[in-house]
Amino acid sequence: MKLKINSQGLKGRLKVPGDKSISHRSIMFGSIAKGKTVIYDILRGEDVLSTIEAFRAMGVEIEDKGEVITVHGKGISELKAPEKALDMGNSGTSTRLLSGILAGLPFETTLFGDDSLSKRPMDRVATPLQLMGAEITGQTDKVKLPMTIKGSTHLKAIDYVLPVASAQVKSAVIFAALQAEGLTKVVEKEKTRSHTEEMLVQFGGELKVSDKTILVPGGQKLVGQKVVVPGDISSAAFWLVAALVVENSELILENVGVNETRTGIIEVIQAMGGQLEILEQDNVAKAATLKVKASQLKGTEISGDLIPRLIDELPIIALLATQAQGQTIIRDAAELKVKETDRIAVVANALNSMGAKIQPTDDGMIIQGGTKLHAPENSINTLGDHRIGMMAAIAALLVKNGEIELERAEAIQTSYPSFFDDLEQLSENI
């Protein structure tokens, strides 16, 4: 795909697609609950479709009527063994969270995925589930896909300290804990996104959260609910950054999810001097309308507890930092190396090819700001990573002459199928 975007500024209002994390979890909770779950504004990306197809393969009736998805749950004990291995596509969320559910079911299931997902570490989720009594095997000593899970109907509760900041691993343990005998204790070193905990309560479940400790009693029964999915702040991030760095831009983004464990990017933008206003905020739905306009920005440091609250936004934040005055340092973000790609290396290579000055480090990047971007000599390959593709498309807005050749742009379908339509709406034709 060739990107040549002659933007004189981005203008308009936009409702970004539904939150990917909440969309996955709404299908999962609806499938293990008893009764009907009705989901509005779900994300229709490839990752979420992988979750839907997995539960259909286990006997769950899931109706898709366009604007509304209805899940007819019969309870977790009614899930059936799938007739064949489950295809997780590119979805790490589907794989890891589903593993927690499968750990307590009386059958054996094999999960497989695409080349990118098959390289990602699954031992981090296999280890606690094995401690609880599930049998999990992969193709190597370090568990990766394809992975086979033989569940146990006698899972035992555990006390588990998460070795890495991972909402996916935490969620897998919580899903398994619902089926375990006793009280499971999960301790986070750094707080990660809290959607699983909040949705468990919404579906009639019970848990106690105290700072970074979560207590989950076993043997719980859940009840179907109505779920309205807010817009995904990780998708909104691309437009927030675009409006900040493209001259004469002003955007209003409606119904953006602002769960406090996900709003690190808002704090970074404010720390960098960006003009960002929260116009309307619904504290119950945890959603807000955001107004953002082109701004003079300054460098900052991003590290520590902030990292899990913006881990998925770091690629586009790196682009933002190239346009700020001064130096931006990102550290404590080694987790970027085991995303869909090694995002430290891939982001640095892509933006440096356009004239940025980014030094990759073991756990982040050092970015010199105030650089003008130009068209790269060679194409930029997403390597199947949706966030790299969208970052490159936003970077193209800053290229005055020439165009960007983007390879494997279809990866963007993973999380934002309407991305290029929205880009066209907010700027000029691609």
UniProtKB/Swiss-Prot annotation:
The active site is at 312 (proton acceptor). Its EC number is 2.5.1.19. 3-phosphoshikimate binds at residues 20-21, 25, 166, 168, 312, 339. One of its GO terms (biological process) is aromatic amino acid family biosynthetic process. This is 3-phosphoshikimate 1-carboxyvinyltransferase. One of its GO terms (molecular function) is 3-phosphoshikimate 1-carboxyvinyltransferase activity. The gene is aroA. It is found in: Cytoplasm. Its main location: cytoplasm. One of its GO terms (cellular component) is cytoplasm. It catalyses: 3-phosphoshikimate + phosphoenolpyruvate = 5-O-(1-carboxyvinyl)-3-phosphoshikimate + phosphate. Keywords: Amino-acid biosynthesis, Aromatic amino acid biosynthesis, Cytoplasm, Transferase. PROSITE patterns: EPSP_SYNTHASE_1 (PS00104), EPSP_SYNTHASE_2 (PS00885). Catalyzes the transfer of the enolpyruvyl moiety of phosphoenolpyruvate (PEP) to the 5-hydroxyl of shikimate-3-phosphate (S3P) to produce enolpyruvyl shikimate-3-phosphate and inorganic phosphate. NCBIfam families: aroA.
